[in-house]
A protein has these predicted regions:
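Glycine-rich active-site loops that engage anionic ligands at enzyme catalytic sites
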Residues: 1-165
Length: 165
């Protein structure tokens, strides 16, 4: 784990392992370090806003002994997907699968929101079957409609607003 000052009011904890991320997430949900106003969760980082470096250091020392517990899911949402998108055939071809196999593999997992980002309300979802991992498009589309489901690398995502992508 790396710990560094981030701007004039933050401390960034980065390069977190899964165990460190789980431990710290559990800890911030139980109580932030002194003088810390809020936190922002990244893919492998946590930004503590308003935190003072010394207070974070002490808080981390206390956290290191914290048992890693499974994080309680905040709820499950069922999202209906219309598999008639323009890229479905090219995804199947790139993965050496049939369209039916892509749909089955994509719709089978229970996904977990890893983080929010890229655009307002866009969830990066863990759980995508490795056979569907694809690089991002070499050139983004100018306009993606809200509700569009995407695959980028090892993640699925859902566009909540119209945007390039």
């Amino acid at each position: 784990m790396k710990c560094r000052i981030y701007g004039d009011r933050g401390v960034l904890l980065s390069s977190l392992s899964e165990a460190e991320r789980s431990r710290l997430l559990h800890r911030v949900e139980s109580g932030l370090p002194p003088a810390c106003d809020e936190y922002v969760l990244g893919y492998d980082s946590i930004l503590l806003i308003g935190a003072q470096t010394i207070a974070v250091q002490e808080w981390l020392e206390q956290t290191n002994g914290t048992e890693v517990r499974a994080i309680k899911p905040s709820g499950c949402r069922i999202i209906e997907v219309d598999y008639t998108g323009a890229d479905l055939d090219s995804v199947a071809q790139a993965c050496n699968l049939t369209v039916t196999e892509v749909i089955e593999l994509h719709s089978a997992p229970v996904y977990t929101v890893r983080m929010m980002g890229f655009s307002p309300g866009f969830p990066y979802l863990d759980g995508l079957d490795p056979r569907l991992h694809l690089d991002r498009r070499s050139s983004p589309r100018d306009h993606i409609l809200p509700g569009t489901v995407a695959i980028g690398g090892a993640h699925a995502g859902i566009y909540s607003v119209a945007s390039p992508g």
